[in-house]
Swiss-Prot record:
Entries under SUPFAM superfamilies matching the protein: Nucleic acid-binding proteins
Boundaries of every S1 motif domain copy: 561-643
Compartment list: Cytoplasm
The protein's Enzyme Commission number: 3.1.13.1
Enzyme class: hydrolase
Swiss-Prot/TrEMBL keywords: Cytoplasm, Exonuclease, Hydrolase, Nuclease, RNA-binding
Gene3D superfamilies registered for this protein in UniProt: 2.40.50.640, Nucleic acid-binding proteins
All residue ranges annotated as the RNB domain in the record: 189-516
A Gene Ontology term for the protein's cellular component: cytosol
Protein name listed in UniProt: Exoribonuclease 2
Coiled-coil segments on the chain, per record: none
Length: 644
């Protein structure tokens, strides 16, 4: 009799509208209960039975109940699920399969089945890609997933690579395709095969994309020709190979191997500037004055060269530092190395005085065995030979940025605007507390930014530098010329790595249009979005594989007295993150390991300090000794403890 009663329906509607609700993100705990985090200040308790309806990370709307002064949340509506597509480990076999997502806070197995047409018989321990199909807040009885891709078996030594690439939906192999003949681009190529061009790379590098030639000029000037591999001589715009490169956007460099943007026949052979092989190049000829400034007579042109030597970073550095056994194979090559070192010094000084120079951080290299096991991790400091190449490339990219800006007004530019204007006052206030006075307006200009950076570099420690990093904006890829505050330059456009960066291929095509005096079409902004997204995914993949390998490498050190020097990189309420100086691994030190009495301990992310009883004991950038307390392989996390 009450079924269609309009009064009852109205009452229900009224009750519903009067019941308090909140939208937020579910945070799970290891104890079964959870919290609905509405914002940084407000969260509501979710009891264990209600947590069965949701998953960590779900964005939901919940009804808020108040009982005896205590508020709790009852999940009501799903706004956005945390899991859609994910990777995980399969449990069970045949008809009764479940998958445990590979995520530190998702421990529960989700019932699943293989998608139709997936011809793999899943078994315990297999890694798979899955997609969520059912959710309790969508009216389903339980969570349910569908296995859409088999990744590999549980004991595969290369799990870190295959699982990571599948997680980020990145390619596992080089693209297919061959380029059989060079295009007729209507370019006149200068024959520079007689010049003593050299390449300087790691011993294992196959995709050499830059060769250098230097010569002394009158009036203490130096000439530098930077010759860059020319894949756009083989790959037509809009062709199948071009489209594949556009999607990949970059070569993906992971520990142990890379997945190239172009087919290996091109990246490692046809386009690679191998010693004693004639190759087409796009080249830039520049004159450097005595103080290292690049003069205005910049010239871009097409050419053919023949590299006369494949030099190796460490050998060149040793020779310039008068150590080691290696000698250049001829006086002509020796003279090239000496001139290039001179150019490097001049350009380094010019950038130090007129732009900005990054502090040198070592590169960490994983040395892997046949089965992907980590034999060692070595820190490779940036030496003179690395700097020779770096200075030459930066100079060449400055030239391209100028030419594209002046001749076309567009290109693919790396733009970094320094500090976010919204943060300028807070930044000035923070610096003032440390005795540095800056004008909030001035610091938003390129000159003001450079001035501040130089003052920070002159500080005895990097502490203040680390405090202001959060006020900086991110570097972006733009079709519009703009400044690069991080480098201290008015404009910066890369073209020196076209084998491994699609944006550099675009700039090659634009520079060729300039050389031929033709009009060019402005690149579409969508391509910069794709490049930025791919760069983000590749970096995450590199980090994920690295975390896995670090965990493998340090597992046998857990619980031992082996000491590691570690730099504090971040402090949060829960503890400190540190980077092991010798190998680059990131480890976490939980707050209880810092001091047993929690009420005497203050870990402040805001100040970058840890205080015990009001005394600052640790701060970001401090280097301390730690031991490895535990390595959790399932989450690839390393827990460290300070040495007392």
């Amino acid at each position: 009799m009450f079924q269609d009663n309009p009064l009852l329906a109205q009452l229900k509607q009224q009750l519903h509208s009067q019941t308090p609700r909140a939208e937020g993100v579910v945070k799970a705990t290891e104890k079964g209960f959870g919290f609905l985090e509405v914002d940084a200040q407000k969260s509501y308790f979710i009891p264990p039975p209600q947590m069965k309806k949701v998953m960590h990370g779900d964005r939901i709307i919940a009804v808020i109940h108040s009982e005896k002064e205590r508020e709790s949340a009852e999940p009501e509506e799903l706004v956005e699920p945390f899991l859609t597509r994910f990777v995980g480990k399969v449990q069970g076999k045949n008809d009764r399969l479940a998958i445990v997502p590979d995520h530190p806070l998702l421990k529960d197995a989700i019932p699943c089945r293989a998608a139709r047409g997936l011809n793999h018989e899943f078994k315990e321990g297999d890694w798979a890609v899955a997609e969520m199909r059912r959710h309790p807040l969508k009216g389903d009885r339980s969570f349910y997933a569908e296995l859409t891709q088999y990744i590999t078996f549980g004991d595969d030594h290369f799990v870190p690579w295959w699982v990571t690439l599948a997680r980020h939906n990145l390619e596992k192999e080089a693209p297919d395709g061959v380029a059989t003949e060079m295009l007729d681009e209507g370019l006149v190529r200068e024959d520079l095969t007689a010049l003593d061009f050299v390449t300087i790379d790691s011993a294992s590098t196959e995709d050499m994309d830059d060769a250098l030639f230097a010569k002394a000029l009158p009036d203490d000037k130096l000439q530098l020709i930077v010759a860059i591999a020319d894949p756009t001589a083989w790959i037509a715009e809009g062709s199948k190979l071009d489209k594949a490169a556009k999607i990949r956007a970059f070569t993906n460099y992971l520990p142990g191997f890379n997945i190239p943007m172009l087919p290996r026949e091109l990246s490692d052979d046809l386009c690679s500037l191998r010693a004693n092989e004639v190759r087409p190049v796009l080249a830039c000829r520049m004159t450097l004055s005595a103080d290292g400034a690049i003069e205005d007579n910049i010239e871009f042109f097409a050419a053919t060269i023949e590299s006369k030597a494949k030099l190796v970073y460490d050998q060149v550095s040793d020779w310039l530092e008068n150590t080691g056994d290696w000698q250049p194979e001829s006086e002509a090559i020796a003279e090239q190395v000496r001139l290039l070192a001179q150019i490097c010094q001049r350009r380094g000084e010019w950038r130090h005085n007129h732009a900005l120079v990054f502090k040198d951080r070592p590169d960490y290299r994983f040395i892997l065995g046949e089965k992907g096991e980590v034999l060692d991790i070595v820190a490779e400091p940036r030496r003179i030979a690395n700097r020779i190449v770096e200075e030459a490339m930066i100079a060449a990219n400055i030239c391209a940025a100028r030419v594209l800006r002046d001749k076309l007004g567009f290109g693919i530019y790396n733009v970094h605007m320094g500090f976010d204007p919204a943060n300028a006052d807070a930044l000035a206030a923070l610096l003032k507390t440390h005795g540095l006075h800056v004008d909030a307006e001035e610091v938003l200009t390129l000159d003001g930014f450079c001035k501040l950076r130089r003052e920070l570099d002159a500080q005895p420690t990097g502490f203040l530098d680390s405090r202001i990093r959060r006020f900086q904006s991110f570097a972006e890829i733009s079709t519009e010329p703009g400044p690069h505050f991080g480098l201290g330059l008015e404009a910066y456009a890369t073209w020196t790595s076209p084998i491994r960066k699609y944006g550099d291929m675009i700039n090659h095509r634009l520079l060729k249009a300039v050389i031929k005096g033709e009009t060019a079409t402005r690149p579409q902004d969508e391509i910069t979005v794709q490049m930025a997204e791919r760069r983000r995914l590749n970096r995450m993949a590199e980090r994920d594989v690295g975390d896995w390998l670090y965990a493998r490498f340090l597992k046998d050190k857990a619980g031992t007295d082996t000491r590691f020097a570690a730099e504090i990189v971040d402090i949060s309420r829960g503890g400190m993150r540190v980077r092991l100086v010798d190998n680059g691994a990131i480890a976490f030190i939980p707050a209880p390991f810092l001091h047993a009495m929690r009420d005497e301990l203050v870990c402040s992310q805001e100040n970058g300090t840890v205080q015990i009883k009001g005394e600052t004991v640790y701060k970001v950038t401090d280097v301390i000794d730690v031991t490895i307390a535990e390595v959790r392989m399932e989450t690839r996390s390393i827990i460290a403890r300070p040495v007392a």
